[in-house]
């Protein structure tokens, strides 16, 4: 996933995940503990935001903070990463502070104290939304996965149970992407923006803006 977000093709992410799905029992794949950063890795925001070579010395890494431009990039990609994490098969695991905007390179710079009262409100709200949506939709908890787009910077997959259906769509590139997705219902709702889309022929046509995301559900 990190390779995809940092410039790799979505097809390589799909192929890697499908190889895991095909080689593991379903309970293992759908019950996996999925994480993007831990106490043994640099902070997710730092890795995704960094645009210049990482500082080489320990002293430099200890005090390095992303520039405003890097921070904006990091937050944008962190939202994409977390949307995929929270809607993918398995259980999303969140390293404390990633939801608050903590930065840092390798241990011990990734193990700072939680920034009580100084959290990033935008990221906090985003993660709360993702958690609420995952609790609300059975499909995101236990639904089977099907890929509908995985080429270049565009990725789209669905999760489905007998009574619930969601599609995650992500554009990790700097240009708009147009997708055509299968959709049975006459309407689809992007629960992230509350925008509705009409579908009359079993196909849903939509455009994802640069670094755009959608989480589509059926309209009740």
Residue ranges, per PLM feature:
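Conserved alpha/beta catalytic core and glycan-binding cleft of carbohydrate-active enzymes
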Residues: 1-107, 159-160, 168, 172-178
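Carbohydrate-interacting/catalytic domains
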Residues: 74-75, 87-94, 98-220
């Amino acid at each position: 996933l990190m390779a995809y977000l940092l410039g790799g093709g979505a097809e390589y992410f799909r192929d890697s995940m499908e190889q895991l799905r095909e080689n593991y029992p379903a309970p293992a794949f759908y019950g996996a503990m999925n994480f993007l950063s831990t106490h043994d890795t640099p902070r997710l925001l730092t890795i995704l935001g960094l645009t210049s070579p990482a500082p080489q010395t320990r002293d430099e890494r200890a005090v390095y903070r992303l520039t405003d431009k890097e921070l904006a990039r990091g937050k944008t990609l962190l939202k994409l990463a977390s949307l995929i994490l929270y809607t993918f098969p398995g259980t999303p695991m969140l390293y404390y502070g990633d939801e608050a905007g903590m930065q840092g390179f390798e241990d011990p710079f990734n193990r700072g104290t939680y920034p009580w009262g100084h959290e990033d409100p935008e990221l906090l709200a985003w993660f709360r939304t993702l958690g609420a949506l995952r609790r609300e939709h059975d499909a995101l908890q236990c639904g089977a996965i099907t890929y509908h787009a995985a080429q270049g910077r565009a990725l789209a997959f669905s999760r489905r149970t007998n009574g619930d259906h969601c599609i995650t769509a992500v554009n990790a590139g700097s240009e708009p992407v147009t997708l055509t997705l299968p959709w049975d219902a006459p309407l689809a709702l992007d629960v992230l923006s509350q925008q509705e889309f009409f579908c009359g022929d079993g196909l849903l046509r939509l455009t994802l803006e640069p670094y755009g995301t959608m989480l589509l559900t059926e309209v009740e």
